[in-house]
Amino acid sequence: MGNAATKESRSSQEHSARHSRGGSTASTAAYDHYRPSDGIHASSSRALRGGRSDFALLGLGAEREPVEHRRETRQEREARKREKENAARIKERQRSMKEEHVDGGYLVTQGVYVGTEDFNKAIVRQLMIERRLAPFWRGLNDFSESWTEHQLMAAARGMPIPAPDEVPPELEYKIPSKSSAEKQPPERNLNTLMVPITSRSQSYNSDTSSINRTISPARSPGALSPTNSFLRGRAKTLASLTTSSKTPASDMAPRELQLPKDPFVNGQPIEAYLYKDASECPICFLYYPPYLNKTRCCDQPICSECFVQIKRPDPHPPEHHDPNNSETTHPDEPEGQLVSEPAACPFCVQPEFGVMYTPPPFRRGLAYAASPGVHALANSSAASSASSLVSGGANPGTRRRAVSISADSPSVITTDRVRPDWATKLAAARAQAARRSAAATALHTAAYMMNNPGGPGEPRRRGMLRRTAGQDSPGGRTAPSHVNAMAYLAERRVVTDRDNASPVDSTTNLAPPRASSRRSRIDELEEMMMMEAIRLSLAAEEERRKKEEKETRKEAKRREKEAKKAEKSAKKAGLDSQNPSNLTSSTSSANSAVQTAGGANSELDMSANKGKGVDRSEPRPGVSTEAGSSTEPPKITIKDLKGEQFSSMLEGSSKNMHLRHVSSASSSNSSLVESAFGESIGSGTPHNGSSSSLAAIHGFRSLAAMIDDTPSGDSGESMNRPGSTNEQVQGAPAVKEPSENSAPNEPDQVTLLSSSPSLEQKDTLGKEVHMSSAEVLPQSSLGTAS
């Protein structure tokens, strides 16, 4: 891979050297350096170059473009920037902690929070040097009131805590005597307790320098007269005033000075003096010196590192804005803009969070020359300064303040003070939102208001919008979508603007003024949301109504189905209860008719054969009359059955039997009956003629002739005595009275049953007819129908 890259680089260099005009010697030397000296390699390289030129003529040997470096993304750029800031912060922290401090505290953070430090470091530094904000104390993870001085020193310096009776060599200290302090040269006091020479004014420098300067022998003694020096000093002062007025305000900031380095306070090391009464920060839970910031509202302690992390929320729409808070409400601001409420207290949630700081009763480290009492506190001893400031300073063990201090107080430092760019960020966010709103307004105008409302394109566009809305919305025509709502609002807005504007302005001003556009957009948005809510409510109500109607129809269908099923079952049960009674009554009538006819024929045959020429026809009517008057009804023949009673009986039985299916048992019975009675019963000959009745009578006579000869008396007794055998029990349903299940519209059957013989004239033929009576009637009905 490396060789290929080298060849490409060489070929590119050779190509550039070959085609360049007036090339420098450096390029020629480079070309000679890369040219091979060997003949074989030279020939091969020439052949290769020739081949490459040939490829170039064909367009195949074009040189590759140099690979472009991948552009750095925004995330990578921000990550690299954060890494650089962290490295610079660590370096500055090490330098500041080594060289600078304020009353034993530091001017840089101690790494409790690892996030970005977006507060103004210059302002925080100035407030700490002015002793209006607590310095960044070093926090202790653990603290015990029984610790000794060297243990407190080790904890404050970040060293491992030694044993109480063990003093490490690096923690040994020796209190300096006053004589050594008095022997310090005045130049050191001048440099440490006063403003440095470079930072003094020009008049002050000139005056002091003229005093220390030796008198030149060329000058006359009169040059140093008081009058001349006064005039010259006055001129210098006026010049300094005029020049200082032209300097920028940043150069007028107070100058820092280094107070004398005294590591002891009241005979104790400064670390032991600070941390002997350590207090815990309720937010980061680290132990600090008792000289912490106190909240202005609830007088709660808070360290500076936690305080600088509290800030205003990012700019956001006013939905979450508290309308009850009158302090943050500005009537001059237009509605609908982004807002950013002041930070609230983390303890009592009171807005305009601010802190107050009471410094310790000594001064060490950096200070400003313009601050009052700096020199007095620096020159005085620790004991005298402590005794003089006990009355004026706040003791950490005093009673907590119960009155809230106003956020406008000079001693209160708010979160907006350490982040003065919050207004700039809010303005930038509002400007960005305004640009977005303007872009949205332009799109809105281009989409809905650029066309002439009265032109031919307006109805088409409106119809297209409505058609699109009908396709998108599930409700179709009944449920308008947000597109219809927007079109309606735009149309109404155009009509309103056209009515309010003059005829001349209506053609030029397509959009409302910028001042009122935001308000109108908010109104339109609210109306659009209201219309959408109404649409959703109507759609929900329509869906609920459709669902309810569907449930109602389903319930009605179910009830109808159940009613049909109940009616069908009731009809089936009614038919089952009616058919056996009708069939039994009809079959009993037929049996009685057939038995009566058979009995009459047998009596005729017996009377003709048994007698010896004696004509017994005369007394027969009398005997039959007696029997009919006593126990029997009148005799009925087949011809008599051809009347209305028999026809109605057959029609009723056929009508009832047509509703039932023929079972296998009934088919077997019908076959048995047909074999017993012959072809005359199941034949297809019509029953309404005399031949059919004669054939039936002939069949019954042949059956009677087959009976063995018996005495006339026995036969008469057997024919005339009441039946008390099993046939009587089996024929009991045939002689029953008409039941309640029998149809009331069949009076013939009732008459026939009432006129049938009751348990009289039973015979074997009658038994067979009774057994097969269930199939005799359908055959007769079919024969009648045919």
UniProtKB/Swiss-Prot annotation:
The segment annotated Disordered runs over 1-46, 59-97, 201-229, 314-337, 383-406, 448-482, 494-520, 542-693, 705-786
- The domain of life is Eukaryota
Biased-composition ranges for Low complexity?
383-393, 577-597, 663-675
Compositional bias (Basic and acidic residues):
7-17, 62-97, 314-333, 542-574, 760-770
| Bias-annotated ranges (Polar residues) | 201-217, 645-656, 682-693, 712-729
- What are the record's GO terms for cellular component? cytoplasm
| Statement: the UniProt record of this protein carries the keyword Cytoplasm | yes
Q: Which UniProt keywords apply?
A: Cytoplasm
The family database entries (InterPro entries) matched by this protein are listed as: Sip5/DA2
> Which protein are we looking at?
Protein SIP5
Q: Which PANTHER family match?
A: PROTEIN SIP5 (PTHR31315:SF1)
As for family, the record states: Belongs to the SIP5 family.
Where does this polypeptide localize?
Cytoplasm
Q: What does this protein do?
A: May negatively regulate the SNF1 kinase.
